[in-house]
Amino acid sequence: MKIQTPDNQWLQYLQDAYHQLLSAAPFPFSKLTPSTIPAVSGVYVITAKLDGKHVPYYVGRSKNLRQRLYKNHLMGPLTNARLKKYLIKSGECGSLHEAKEFIKACCWARWIGEPDIRVRGAIEGYVTGMLFPKYGIYEEH
């Protein structure tokens, strides 16, 4: 039995969103404040600038980018900040403090707004598949 698939316009939409996200201006976590991030829903990618290159570390989506990027990823505890948890679990950082300092010193965020929850999920999945970030893929429920 053949599965019904979306038309080519949908694939083009995902590709356009991917390129829009990658071409968004990267913003360093070291200069991140709540007012620098819009309080809108969207998809984001966190990269670590290592040896002059932006290495994809994490792709995510949120109903509130300001909350997710600033309050959770940068300022939040391990329960809300998956990237910090992954940095510690992998041994890249030795503690919560060290993970936060790594994010502030090395990480950058890019984001695009997207109001529709299903579309956000599709964009997140597409971007994750294309960038294959260092963290965030291996957990299954």
What are these regions (language model features)?
Residues 1-63, 67-71, 97-98, 111-118, ...:
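GIY-YIG nuclease catalytic motif and its immediate N-terminal context
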Residues 129-138:
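Mixed-charge intrinsically disordered linker/loop segments at interdomain junctions
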Residues 74-108:
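Acidic, metal/cofactor-coordinating or nucleic-acid-engaging core segments within structured domains
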